[in-house]
């Protein structure tokens, strides 16, 4: 007989490790599972030097968060452990974040953290503790398939859905993970937290990248990759120099204000060229991209990726965490994979994720995804656009 987590055995005989960040979502997850009788163990990861982030609203994984997680564990009566993952986090997430920015990409550190820290290292720790599953407070769901494996699906609350950040989850990891909040709304979660008497019931949501509590990611990039702060030229699509800048890291795709150049028509940042330290600007229509070349593709759909793609697979993709999935085609191309967007997208950026879905709305199944290597217009009007990687938008919402 299966319990509420779709696992064999009675809840009291089933150990569940909960990843507790100190926020209301993971805290409610732990309290909910404890109330259902599970043998719950809470684990909080210390990921970075958190002193500067203490007590700051909108920052996660900070010193105050560790205190809050411990207080919740004491309240609901579960063991709680803090694991020092600072060196792993520095190498796997922070260093790669800075390196990605220095090459003109816009990384999504939450994806890398989930992939290499939470769902690899922490999951291994949970298994070592004899847990039957690792539960998190993500707003996403999973369901059992006919063969016993699990599918990743969007949360019922589309405005809270975090599936974009979890596309890199492997099949093996997905079978071990559980997401108890997948069918809840945020207000319902907070109401449960109040019911359980949790001190974090009204705690602010995390909004910044956790290791950038000030919101100024350029401080991190500048410290680790000073070359990203070197001055360069601002040029138009024909290569004409329009002005100077003080580092490509200060610019984002679609940016119009603060360019420091005069023009009779509106100009937008189109892309960054780190090798020449150039910022390329142009008209708004030049922002639209239609073809995306992917790297590091992860497939969690049925069968193998190559068999599923065949001569072309019609699906839906999301190239920003805040956008709804849009129609696209996934094709094999030159030993890799390429996505063709039916309607196109403004500001597609290398380093961001392109996530695959089987439907445009509702609790769609996540089929996988990849990181964007480059993007081009379907029919570039300027030779300067052909084959050139697109530039980057604002850092994606880091909640997750």
Swiss-Prot record:
Residues 160-162 are annotated as: Interaction with tRNA. Keywords: ATP-binding, Cytoplasm, Disulfide bond, Nucleotide-binding, RNA-binding, Transferase, tRNA processing, tRNA-binding. One of its GO terms (molecular function) is tRNA-uridine 2-sulfurtransferase activity. Its EC number is 2.8.1.13. Disulfide bonds join 113-210. It catalyses: S-sulfanyl-L-cysteinyl-[protein] + uridine(34) in tRNA + AH2 + ATP = 2-thiouridine(34) in tRNA + L-cysteinyl-[protein] + A + AMP + diphosphate + H(+). One of its GO terms (cellular component) is cytoplasm. It is found in: Cytoplasm. GO terms for biological process: tRNA wobble position uridine thiolation. ATP binds at residues 19-26, 45, 137. The record marks 138, 352 as: Interaction with tRNA. The active site is at residues 113, 210. Gene3D superfamilies: Adenine nucleotide alpha hydrolases-like domains, HUPs, Translation factors. Belongs to the MnmA/TRMU family. HAMAP family: tRNA_thiouridyl_MnmA. This is tRNA-specific 2-thiouridylase MnmA. The gene is mnmA.
